[in-house]
Regions:
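Conserved AMP-binding/adenylate-forming
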Residues: 1-43, 171-176
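Secondary-structure transition/capping motifs at alpha-helix termini
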Residues: 3, 26-28, 80-83, 136-138, ...
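Short beta-strand segments
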Residues: 8, 88-91, 146, 172
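Flexible loop/turn segments at secondary-structure boundaries
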Residues: 14-17, 95-97, 137-140, 152, ...
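Aromatic/hydrophobic pocket-lining residues that form π-stacking "cages" and hydrophobic walls in ligand
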Residues: 19, 73, 184-185
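Structural core segment of the AMP-binding/adenylate-forming
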Residues: 25-108
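AMP-binding/adenylate-forming
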Residues: 28-31, 46-58, 128-131, 142-185
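Conserved pre-ATP/AMP-binding loop-to-beta segment of ANL
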Residues: 87-90, 100-132, 139, 149, ...
Length: 185
């Protein structure tokens, strides 16, 4: 519901961006965590953001190897003081994760049985998302961006910083767990 936090721990797949957009439509605050983080780093961000739901992928695919996300998520939840009650897992065919009864749900099953909802009205200063700093100089800090400020900053920076005009193509190699990837992908 509006104002709830939803942590997204997924590889760079379309479902990650769709999850961000779904949260925005519902007025929920999405918290994207870089998929390469180990359980202790993820647990730190779970404790701080206190998400009502976690959306995760079963795995990520890197050159020459598969990275299983679900065991890292399970360990992070075990380590975290804040206990998440529901996890929606996007099962990738290359690595089907074991789901924990009562806590974990197959995201595709939920999508298949979903229905359309109207967008929830939000104020320009309502939080849109939280992204965490890397934590290299101390504890990671959750940076809150609001709906209006984020939209205005993106529009302005695309032209003023990158010189882009309508119809131009932009490519960013960053992960959506970092501000460049989150903002420009």
């Amino acid at each position: 519901k509006k104002g709830d936090r939803v942590l997204i721990y997924m590889p760079m797949i379309p479902e990650a961006v769709a999850s961000m957009l779904a949260c925005a439509r519902l007025g929920a605050i999405h918290v994207v965590v870089f998929g390469g983080f180990a359980p202790n780093e993820l647990a730190t961000r779970i404790n701080d953001s206190k998400p009502q739901i976690i959306i995760a992928g079963s795995c990520g695919i890197e050159p020459g190897k598969i990275i299983e996300y679900k065991p890292m998520l399970d360990k992070a939840i075990e380590l975290a003081k804040y206990k998440v009650k529901k996890c929606f897992i996007f099962q990738r065919e290359i690595c089907i994760a074991n789901l924990i009864d009562g806590r974990d749900f197959n995201l595709q099953d939920l999508i298949d049985n979903s229905f359309s909802v109207s967008p929830v009205p939000v104020k320009s200063n309502d939080p849109l998302y939280i992204l965490y700093t890397s934590g290299t100089t101390g504890d990671p800090k959750g940076m809150v961006r609001d709906n209006g400020g984020h939209a205005v900053a993106l529009k302005n920076s695309m032209n003023m910083v990158y010189g882009l005009q309508q119809g131009d193509v932009f490519w960013a190699a960053s992960d959506i767990g970092w501000v460049v990837g989150h903002s420009y992908i």
